[in-house]
């Protein structure tokens, strides 16, 4: 037996946004107990499906600004309905063979910009998820918020996983110039700056996106490098001393990834901690194109052995690397690890 979807969606939204009114706390506890009982009984399949669908819808709403904020640094992001196919317009720089003035005399050659289009064919990205019904019944609001936010973060990581795969393949195939890549052991700030110097020619201040461990690795070299330490401002010194996430590395801006532990021993995380990406900031030509087809979806089953609720999170999207020359890859293979 399903309950009123619109009312439940409104309740979920108020709980997640800390805008609960008089009875909302009691209402969500009552609703969760209707779905899961005391946490030890088998949920009604239709109510469980409704609950998980609404949880994923709310997670998708939370994920949208996170995805947009992160992906906008490295990709042109577009939305499209499922079933449609979006055409990606790709600017192409071409030399004009001959350009004549009105009087017939020759003029200097110039670059003119044309366009070609390619179809953004969607692929299905997915990841697994599970939760314990007893947790939701015991502490409904805390675990409900955690469940929704964990799914939202999982969507962000779906895109990052795809970007990791694409860049690795592009490096192997030679689609990313060698000057844009620094891979090795005990990389120095000078090597980091070589990649930044390449990308700054595209315009804007380069942006480095990585795990906080890799950002710290390069950021703290600013205090010991024989050249950089002479140019450190008091502001940067203060940031290195007190900031949880340093944002300045030389002439680049650093942006740290959300990369939580995935095990109980704090020894594994979702994404590589030793690999980061650099992009030209503030320019329209981004290296990636992302077309998102529809929203996040889920498939549900309950494991009869451990009684966990298992979900498959699915997103259809087209993720393409269009301009390999506009991305930098930095991978430290020795000094940075969990």
Swiss-Prot record:
Descriptive protein name: SPbeta prophage-derived uncharacterized protein YonB
Protein's gene: yonB
Lineage start: Bacteria, Bacillati, Bacillota, Bacilli, Bacillales
Highest rank taxon of the organism: Bacteria
């Amino acid at each position: 037996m399903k309950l009123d979807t619109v009312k439940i969606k409104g309740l979920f939204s108020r709980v997640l946004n800390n805008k609960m009114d008089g009875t909302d706390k009691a209402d969500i506890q009552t609703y969760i107990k209707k779905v899961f009982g005391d946490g030890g009984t088998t949920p009604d399949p239709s109510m469980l499906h409704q609950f998980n669908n609404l949880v994923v819808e709310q997670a998708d709403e939370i994920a949208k600004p996170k995805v947009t904020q992160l992906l906008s640094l490295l990709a042109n992001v577009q939305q499209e309905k499922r079933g449609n196919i979006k055409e990606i317009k790709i600017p192409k720089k071409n030399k004009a063979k001959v350009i004549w003035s009105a009087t017939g005399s020759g003029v200097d050659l110039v670059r003119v910009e044309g366009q070609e289009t390619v179809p953004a064919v969607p692929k299905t990205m997915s990841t697994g998820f599970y939760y314990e019904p007893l947790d939701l019944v015991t502490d409904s609001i805390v675990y409900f918020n955690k469940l929704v936010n964990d799914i939202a973060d999982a969507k962000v990581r779906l895109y990052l996983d795809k970007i990791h795969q694409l860049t690795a393949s592009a490096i192997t195939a030679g689609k990313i110039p060698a000057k844009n890549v620094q891979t090795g052991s005990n990389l120095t700030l000078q090597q980091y700056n070589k990649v930044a110097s390449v990308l700054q020619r595209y315009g804007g201040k380069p942006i480095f996106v990585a795990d906080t461990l890799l950002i710290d690795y390069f950021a703290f070299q600013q205090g010991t490098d024989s050249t950089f330490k002479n140019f450190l401002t008091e502001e940067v010194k203060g940031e290195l001393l007190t900031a949880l996430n340093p944002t300045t590395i030389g002439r680049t801006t650093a942006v740290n990834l959300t990369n939580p532990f995935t095990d109980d021993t704090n020894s594994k995380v979702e994404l590589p901690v030793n690999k980061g990406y650099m992009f030209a900031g503030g320019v329209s030509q981004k290296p990636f194109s992302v077309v998102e087809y529809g929203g996040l979806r889920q498939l549900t089953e309950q494991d009869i052995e451990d009684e966990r609720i298992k979900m498959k999170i699915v997103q259809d999207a087209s993720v393409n690397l269009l301009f390999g020359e506009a991305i930098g890859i930095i991978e430290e293979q020795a000094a940075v690890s969990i």
